[in-house]
């Protein structure tokens, strides 16, 4: 049976982290799974919660002594998966602030079982909804991703940025091997990293599918949006780089 690895980027998530851990456990009852939390220099009780819950849950924590940002956190989680996961394992990435309901892990895994290499929880499918995001932000997102579908088309994909995904571990291993540190080049652009990762997995031939889901942004503590101008600039740079380098090359040997 394939192992399920749930990858959580954690940064000051004490308010909802414990609830999320319990919900992941409930969603994966009957499965062989492990939670891998990449703690990005949290200054609250997140690390203590993870250490305490490791007594009753299969939790591995990768720790950043200081905050390094979402992209570096995601990259380090992918490197962990490439090193430790078996070829048949499945890696699920999701936010640790409880905005991503673990109940959607099951339909994501169903898409993997049906032949997908990457299954995405999409905000832009019939039956999807976004709760707690103002209308103007939703319209802005629709416009940005419509442009990405024109300039960086991926068959079957409407949501390029949602980080709630299931991926085959062997695909992640190949991506880490082929791209090396260039797997996420735009690390300083924050949330752009999820679209960059998806595009590079697509360039490796990944079959991508989506399932509808409800994003509960009203559960989030604080604000996590990038300014609109920086978002546009980041996606513009991603489009430019995607056109400038259409095929991955072998990483340099050092």
Give residue ranges: language-model regions.
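Hydrophobic helical membrane-anchoring modules
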Residues: 1-4, 15, 30, 107, ...
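Short hydrophobic beta-strand elements that form part
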Residues: 5-9, 36-37, 63
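Active-site beta-to-alpha loop of glycosyltransferases that engages the nucleotide-sugar donor
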Residues: 8-22, 41
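Acidic donor-diphosphate engagement hotspot in glycosyltransferases and nucleotidyltransferases
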Residues: 20, 46, 74, 103-105, ...
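Short, acidic, metal-binding catalytic loop of nucleotide-sugar glycosyltransferases
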Residues: 22-32
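A conserved acidic beta->alpha catalytic loop
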Residues: 39-48, 66, 98
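Acceptor/aglycone-binding surface of glycosyltransferases and processive sugar-polymer synthases
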Residues: 60, 64-83, 88-90, 102-184, ...
């Amino acid at each position: 049976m394939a192992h399920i690895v749930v990858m959580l980027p954690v940064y000051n998530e004490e308010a909802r982290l414990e609830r999320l851990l319990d919900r992941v456990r409930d969603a994966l009852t009957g499965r062989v799974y492990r939670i891998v939390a990449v703690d990005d220099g949290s200054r609250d009780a997140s690390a203590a919660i993870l250490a305490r819950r490791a007594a009753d849950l299969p939790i591995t924590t990768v720790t950043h002594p200081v905050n390094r940002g979402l992209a570096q956190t995601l990259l380090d989680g992918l490197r962990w998966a490439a090193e430790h996961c078996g070829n048949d394992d499945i890696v699920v990435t999701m936010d640790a602030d409880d905005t991503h309901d673990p109940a959607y892990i099951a339909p994501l895994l169903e898409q993997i079982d049906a032949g997908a290499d990457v299954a995405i929880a999409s905000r832009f499918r019939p039956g999807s909804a976004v709760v707690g995001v103002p209308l103007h932000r939703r319209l802005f997102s629709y416009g940005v991703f419509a442009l990405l579908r024109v300039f960086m088309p991926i068959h079957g994909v409407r949501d390029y940025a949602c980080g709630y995904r299931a991926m085959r571990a062997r695909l992640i291993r190949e991506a880490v091997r082929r791209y090396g540190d260039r797997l996420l080049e735009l690390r300083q652009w924050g949330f752009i990293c999820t679209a960059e990762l998806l595009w590079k997995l697509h360039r490796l031939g990944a079959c991508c599918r989506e399932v509808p889901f409800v994003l509960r942004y009203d559960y989030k503590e604080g604000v996590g949006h990038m300014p609109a101008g920086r978002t546009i600039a980041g996606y513009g740079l991603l489009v430019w780089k995607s056109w400038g380098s259409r095929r991955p090359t072998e990483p340099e040997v050092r």
